[in-house]
Amino acid sequence: MTPIIKWTLMQRRWSMLWWSIGIISLVVLTLAFYPTIHNQAAQLNKSFGGLSNSTLALFGGTDFFSPVGYLNSQLIYLMLPLLLAILGIGLGSSLIGREESEGTIELLLARPVSRTKLLIAKVLAGGLNILIVTAIGSAVTILMAEAVNIGIPAGNIAAACFACFMLVLTFSSLAFLLAATGRGRSAAIGISVVYALGGYIIGSLASTVHWLKGPSLIFPYHYYRSADILRGTFDWTSIIFFAAFTLGCIVVAWFSFRRRDVE
C-alpha cells in the first residue's frame, strides 16, 4: 500500500508544486494590499456601505475592511476554498478515474494488493496532496499576516485553514465516489462542481433568505464558519459534518468499487 501512495504522490509532484506556487502568489498579493486598505478603511466602508446583506453574505457576511473581515472575505471564505476545491475535485475524480480511462488500472489490480487497500492508498495519497498544498498556503498566510500586522492570532488562522481543508475534502471525496462508481471523470467533475458552487451560493444566502435555510443544511458550505474561527470561536460541529460526509463518500466508493467490473 505504501508504494502506491508514494507512486501517486510522485506522479503529482509537479501539480502540487504549481498549485502551491499559485496559492502562495494569491496569499502574498492579497495580504500585501492590507496596509493600504486598512489606512483607508473609513472611506471604503462609506463607499461599500450600500451593499445588500445578500451581497455581503456571499463574501462571508463580515465587514470587508476590518482585519477579520478582510482576511475572511478576500481569502479564507471564498478564494482559498475555491482554488483548493478545483484541485481537490480534479484530484478526486482522477485517483481512480484517470487510470481506469487510460487502461492502466489493470496494472495496479494485478499487484498483490486487494481493491480495498488500493482504494485506501489512493484516498490517503489524495488527502496528503491536498493537505500539503493547504499547509503551505496556511504557513504563508500566517507569515504574511504577521508581516502586515493584521492582528489575528496565528492559531486562529491555522484553524480556519484546517476547516477549509476539511471543507475541500467533502468536494474531493464526492468526486472520488462518482469516479469510483464508474460515472466517468467528466461527470464526476461536473456534478461535484455544481454541488460545491451551488452549496456556496445557497449556504451563503441562507442567512438572509429564509426559505434557503432548510436546503442549505445538506451543503458543506452551510457549516463553514471561517469568520467565527478567525475570531477565535472554533465549532467542532462543522468538522464532524465534514469528516462524516467525507467518510461516507469513501465507504460508498469502497462498496461500489469492490463489486463492479473495471474495464
Give the ranges of each region predicted by the language model.
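Aromatic- and glycine-rich beta-strand/loop motifs that create alpha-glucan
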Residues: 1-24
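Secretory targeting signals
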Residues: 24, 28-32, 69, 120-182, ...
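Transmembrane helix boundary and interhelical loop/hinge segments in multi-pass membrane proteins
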Residues: 89-109, 123
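Hydrophobic/aromatic residues in alpha-helical transmembrane segments
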Residues: 88-92, 140, 173-174, 220, ...
